[in-house]
Amino acid sequence: GDGSITGDTTLNLLDGASLTVNNANSYAGDTVLGDGSKLVVGNAGALGTSTVLLQGDSVLELTTGTWNGLGTRLNVNSSGTLKLSGNASGTTTAALTGVRYELGANTTLTLSAGTYGNTITGAGTLISAVGTNVLNGNVDITGEYRVLATNGTACTWTLGAGASVTAGSFIGRYEYNGTTTLNISRDAVMNITGTLRIARDGKGVMNIGSGGMVLAQTLDLGQNWDGVSAKGATINLNGGSLLLGSGGMT
């Protein structure tokens, strides 16, 4: 319908309930999803200024717009799944420790700087924003994983002990002219089914710790950029393993 939710209304979805909201709303009360419930949001303004609490195995699915988890849109005590589908995108924060993320094709999730133990799956693109990022959870996506940085500034990305990342491709630094350090910790596994590029301009270092394993179909050590001589990325095998597929090393 054409109605809307206004005022200090609290929206509660009982256990197992399902609701789709496509209209913009202006309510300011809480939105609470009970265990097993699902709320599908098809309008960037559908939740008004509400804070959403995900309980149990509830699902909040966003099909359009840009979601910002850096604010208070998801309660930090949430334990369900945030699903991005359609053309939705979002930026999240490490404070949401209990949330699982599911990325549909053509969607993008950005991790702000911090340490993450979350489970992230799907077919979309995952981005680690500027700053130090540590992954202690499990990532399994068929899209690209990209690490962002500031031009001319060093950046660090770490896959924690026992953690795993599977992605269709990986770029350890998308920007140019700054050293990138990728740390694969003890017993961590990185599995890139396409091309693993440590840094676009070759100014990168990958450290693979004891028991750590990196698998890639193709390893790209990087190219010279803007006339600056770069020998390509450096890989340090500190008791770890590197296995390449038919694409070899370029």
Cite the ranges covered by each PLM segment.
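Extracellular/lumenal glycan-associated surfaces
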Residues: 185, 203-212
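Parallel beta-helix/beta-solenoid
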Residues: 11-16, 105, 124-132
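Short aromatic-glycine motifs in intrinsically disordered, low-complexity regions
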Residues: 62, 107-110
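Surface-exposed loop/turn positions within long extracellular repeat scaffolds
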Residues: 2-8, 17-78, 83-98, 114-123, ...
